[in-house]
């Protein structure tokens, strides 16, 4: 069986895996980083390739998922604010180093491909993945094909505005973007926004700077009034964004991944009726909303799958 190296470049860590054509992760490495440089990526990939070769695995290609705007035809990172990279020739650098095919794409698109091929989206033709973490990443599959857009920018679902007049300021500079309202960061901001109504709340008593979306969610599950109010507003905004996605794409399935998805049924059961109420132009209940099946492995599995398929872009694309 052919294998590929799948690499997921995160803001504070790199995950590298050897993945087979069946989508099974055979070896996996996690590397915590303070500042990601090209040399670090090269050394991590080299170590992973050596592991595979020590076990007589046939490494056919390398796939990289990176945050930012990626030229999927050349493998260049056009712009990645996470790493302060601009027009960085990541694909070319790795191809010269290892003399095997290397393919680079946006990390959320890679995760979408992984979930579509081997996770929640398997067996569907129209599928959307949303990753709720610090921000909101995403990817769209339409009629069985990953939607890339004219310049590889399709799927930036996190930056459509759901509260343009009364929302939080997004990192992109706009007001009320989906990710500003319904990401893990958005949940924290909701907690601070409703805090004046809960002057005796214990949620912010200790180290407010360390408040996390996980802490808020757990407190909401335990019935804390402050956390419940923040969670209610967060779920309302999540429902708005999901209803918009259904109107835009009309997928069979929306999978929710990322750190916030660990809320599981507590999140899904709360958001589904609101989405149904907001869905007007397509038949209600025709889109299922589920927690993504592959979890943190989706990016690596998708990157490796992309590499084994020969990339995301065909040779005739201009």
Question: Which residues fall in each region the model found?
Answer:
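Hydrophobic "anchor" residues
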Residues: 24-25, 77, 146-147
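Short loop/edge segments at beta-strand edges and connector loops
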Residues: 104-106
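Glycine-rich phosphate-binding loop of actin/hexokinase-like ATP-binding domains
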Residues: 122-181
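A charged helix-plus-loop insertion that forms the helical arch/lid used to bind
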Residues: 75-86
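Short hydrophobic alpha-helix segments
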Residues: 28-31, 81, 150
